[in-house]
């Protein structure tokens, strides 16, 4: 895992097309902005895990149409 330190307003690049910018820090919360192409999905981890579990749940239900 790469660990970086950034200040408010600073940005990091992921590849050539994705940027992550620190927008603010309040207590133990950090606001970040992610700028990515439409074809790149960006989700919070808990939402991504729910999407994945729903996908695997629907694919294991059979598919008898």
Curated annotation (Swiss-Prot):
<dbReference type="GO" id="GO:0048027">
    <property type="term" value="F:mRNA 5'-UTR binding"/>
</dbReference>
<dbReference type="GO" id="GO:0006109">
    <property type="term" value="P:regulation of carbohydrate metabolic process"/>
</dbReference>
<dbReference type="InterPro" id="IPR036107">
    <property type="entry name" value="CsrA_sf"/>
</dbReference>
<comment type="function">
    <text>A key translational regulator that binds mRNA to regulate translation initiation and/or mRNA stability. Mediates global changes in gene expression, shifting from rapid growth to stress survival by linking envelope stress, the stringent response and the catabolite repression systems. Usually binds in the 5'-UTR; binding at or near the Shine-Dalgarno sequence prevents ribosome-binding, repressing translation, binding elsewhere in the 5'-UTR can activate translation and/or stabilize the mRNA. Its function is antagonized by small RNA(s).</text>
</comment>
<keyword id="KW-0810">Translation regulation</keyword>
<comment type="subunit">
    <text>Homodimer; the beta-strands of each monomer intercalate to form a hydrophobic core, while the alpha-helices form wings that extend away from the core.</text>
</comment>
<dbReference type="GO" id="GO:0045948">
    <property type="term" value="P:positive regulation of translational initiation"/>
</dbReference>
<keyword id="KW-0678">Repressor</keyword>
<dbReference type="GO" id="GO:0005829">
    <property type="term" value="C:cytosol"/>
</dbReference>
<dbReference type="InterPro" id="IPR003751">
    <property type="entry name" value="CsrA"/>
</dbReference>
<keyword id="KW-0694">RNA-binding</keyword>
<keyword id="KW-0010">Activator</keyword>
<protein>
    <recommendedName>
        <fullName>Translational regulator CsrA</fullName>
    </recommendedName>
</protein>
<keyword id="KW-0963">Cytoplasm</keyword>
<dbReference type="GO" id="GO:0006402">
    <property type="term" value="P:mRNA catabolic process"/>
</dbReference>
<dbReference type="Pfam" id="PF02599">
    <property type="entry name" value="CsrA"/>
</dbReference>
<comment type="similarity">
    <text>Belongs to the CsrA/RsmA family.</text>
</comment>
<dbReference type="GO" id="GO:0045947">
    <property type="term" value="P:negative regulation of translational initiation"/>
</dbReference>
């Amino acid at each position: 895992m790469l660990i970086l330190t950034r200040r408010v307003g600073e940005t990091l690049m992921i590849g050539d097309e994705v940027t992550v910018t620190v927008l603010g820090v309040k207590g133990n919360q950090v606001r970040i902005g992610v700028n990515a192409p439409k074809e790149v999905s960006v989700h919070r981890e808990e939402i991504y895990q729910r999407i994945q579990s729903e996908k695997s749940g629907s694919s294991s239900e059979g598919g008898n149409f």
